[in-house]
Amino acid sequence: MSLKTHHTPIFTALALVALGSLDGALASSGGGSLPWESPLQQIQQSITGPVAGFIALAAVAIAGAMLIFGGELNDFARRLCYVALVGGVLLGATQIVALFGATGASIGELHSQVDPFGYSPSPKLIERGEGAHG
């Protein structure tokens, strides 16, 4: 038996142990957020914030005034006004929805119900709509 074949199982076992011990170290090195999340969150806050409301209001007012008082507009200018009008409405859509009091989607509410015998609480889904009454 040569020295090369004698040490191969030992090196294989050591390599497997080393790879198994690296798994936790490699998994725990992540910061939890991806590098593009921060710029996307800033863009989202800019689009849905108060600045977007003012931009949407100005775009709707200017495009509407151009369509009403613009007189004879060529096809390109009219389409540009329509694009500005639709963009203003889309940017102001969150403010329009918030105007009616809607804050977000709520499909079902989970409430915790405590058992009278002192067992741990279990979540209970409150059903609403047609299927709620049987």
Curated annotation (Swiss-Prot):
It is found in: Cell membrane. GO terms for cellular component: plasma membrane. The chain crosses the membrane at residues 10-30, 51-71, 80-100. Signal peptide: none annotated. Its main location: membrane. Keywords: Cell membrane, Conjugation, Membrane, Plasmid, Transmembrane, Transmembrane helix. It is a multi-pass membrane protein. The keyword Transmembrane helix applies. It comes from the Bacteria. Belongs to the TrbC family. This is Conjugal transfer protein TrbC. It comes from Rhizobium radiobacter (Agrobacterium tumefaciens).
